[in-house]
Design a protein with these regions (language model features):
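Short, low-complexity N-terminal intrinsically disordered segments enriched in polar/charged residues
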Residues: 1-40, 146-150
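A beta-strand edge to alpha-helix "cap/lid" segment located at domain peripheries
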Residues: 2-13, 69-150
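Short, well-ordered alpha-helical segments
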Residues: 15, 61-64, 112
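Hydrophobic aliphatic residue packing
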Residues: 21, 42, 47, 63, ...
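A solvent-exposed, acidic/Ser-Thr-rich amphipathic alpha-helical stretch
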Residues: 32-91
Length: 150
């Protein structure tokens, strides 16, 4: 088992999301799983997101709480197309990547693209600013229902 989650979860040591983030932050941050990469006082901002999702989460435990039920809604099978841009003087990395999976609730495919601006201090992520494609989330979740568009 990873430090904060099971190895097989989307965020665990064997999860494709963690593997691509670990690859993008190689040499900058260390951790046994996604949550272990985060500093205790990390700030995570969701600049482009979906309705009902928080715009900001403070602290590692807050991020763990936010994602505690994620595996019940979405399964990520693969993550790819990683592009990494770094400013070593500022300890900042910009990661562009894609995730592919399916909605657990609808069985619909989930294919999303992300851009994450990540600040690292003392080998832990201290700030994470995330941009995602909300339409991909809507498509996977079946929202809005087609009948409501008539």
């Amino acid at each position: 088992m990873s430090k904060y989650t099971s190895d097989s979860s989307n965020f665990g040591a064997d999860g494709p999301f963690f593997r691509i983030i670990r690859e993008g932050l190689e040499g900058l941050a260390d951790g046994e799983d996604y949550f272990d990469l985060l500093a205790d006082d990390v700030v995570v901002e969701y600049v482009i997101s979906v309705p009902g999702y928080p715009r900001r989460v403070d602290g590692r435990q807050g991020v763990i709480d936010l994602y505690s039920g994620y595996d019940d809604y979405m399964t990520v099978h693969t993550a790819d197309n990683l592009r990494v841009y770094r400013d070593p003087e500022a300890s900042v990395a910009v990661l562009e990547y894609e995730v592919h999976g399916e909605s657990v609730l609808t069985g619909r495919p989930y294919n999303n693209r992300f851009a994450s601006i990540i600040t690292v201090k003392d080998r832990k992520v201290t700030h994470w600013r995330d941009y995602l494609d909300p339409i991909a989330v809507f498509d996977a979740s079946g929202w809005p229902k087609r009948s409501s568009l008539r």
